[in-house]
A protein has these predicted regions:
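Outer-membrane beta-barrel signature, preferentially recognizing the C-terminal barrel domain
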Residues: 1-3, 7-11, 118, 132-133, ...
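Face-selective signature of the C-terminal outer-membrane beta-barrel domain
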Residues: 2-121, 128-132, 198-205
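A broad, low-specificity signal for short, low-complexity segments enriched in glycine/proline
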Residues: 89, 143-144
Length: 207
């Protein structure tokens, strides 16, 4: 297994920050019998990842934009004819952390994903709100989700310990989801209760 990475963080100004990173990971597997490689269990998975993240602070608010790129290469005896597969996925996103009042915080974000092994693209969003007032807090959140299938899920065909065969599905589509969450929390103190004093917290959550 080989892995390496590079990362740079640049403070462009008092309110501007840029972060760029690169990651490399390669996992190789082979089988040897009597010190000779059989080539019937060769496996190589190689991933290259690039990420850029920029943030700008103005007042109590923060704007963050970024992008990711992943190149995934896999060759394995569990593919038909020991062939290799390759795919690219990338995304771009923006997030705004807004604090208009001392007791109110709003976070809104938008993200677009591209997946080379499918004609489907996806744009997902997130909106979160939190407010606090006299020991009470309310949190409301919506988030859209996206997950692209892996090369293993699409193309691997292998025998599971002679019990069953597992077949990949090359027509597998990306997963999409919508998540909603609402929570009410109350914190307080117990005073002058005889032998008992302390703090308490009550949370009611739905999703």
């Amino acid at each position: 297994d080989y892995s390496a990475g590079l990362k740079t963080v640049m403070n462009l100004s008092e309110n501007d920050n840029l972060e760029i990173s690169y990651g490399f990971d390669q996992y190789d597997k082979a089988r040897y019998v009597n010190d000779e490689r059989t080539h019937d269990h060769d496996y190589t998975n190689r991933q290259n990842t690039v990420r850029a993240l920029y943030s700008h602070i103005f007042g109590k608010n923060t704007l963050t934009v970024g992008a990711d790129f992943l190149n995934d290469y896999l060759t394995t005896y569990q593919f038909e004819d020991n062939e290799s597969k390759n795919q690219n996925s990338c995304d771009a996103f923006a997030q705004f952390d807004y604090n208009p009042l001392q007791w109110l915080n709003i976070v809104a974000s938008l993200r677009h994903d591209y997946f080379s092994a499918s004609s489907q693209h996806a744009t997902t969003g997130r909106l979160a709100l939190m407010t606090k007032w006299k020991g009470f807090s309310i949190r409301a959140n919506y988030a859209g989700g996206f997950r692209a299938p892996t090369l293993k899920e699409m193309y691997m065909n292998f025998d599971m310990a002679d019990m069953q065969m597992i077949y990949g599905n090359p027509d597998l589509k990306p997963e999409k989801s919508n998540n909603y969450n609402l929570a009410l929390e109350h914190t307080g103190r117990v005073k002058n209760a005889g032998f008992f004093t302390g703090q308490y917290s009550l949370t009611l959550m739905g999703y």
